Swiss-Prot record:
Localization: Cytoplasm
Region of interest called Disordered, as start-end residue ranges on this chain: 1-31, 56-76
Recorded GO CC terms: cytoplasm
The entry's keywords: Cytoplasm
Biased composition (Basic and acidic residues): 12-31, 63-76
Protein name: UPF0291 protein BPUM_1689
Amino acid sequence: MISKNQLARINELSKKSKETGLSDAEKTEQKQLREEYLKAFRSSMKNTLKTVKIVDPEGNDVTPEKLKRERDQNLH
């Protein structure tokens, strides 16, 4: 999970980049922070999707088999 301080720094660097530009060190820091943020976001999204159950209008479970297998693996 990314901390509030890291998120604030990402936003600060983004704002500065639009207003005055960033130094090479700041560009490197921004890239690293964005990569950490995306990694945390993707992990969270995968965990959320593993809990989803898809049901058709008739009430039948139509969750893809791959998703069902991944969900079952996490339970054991």
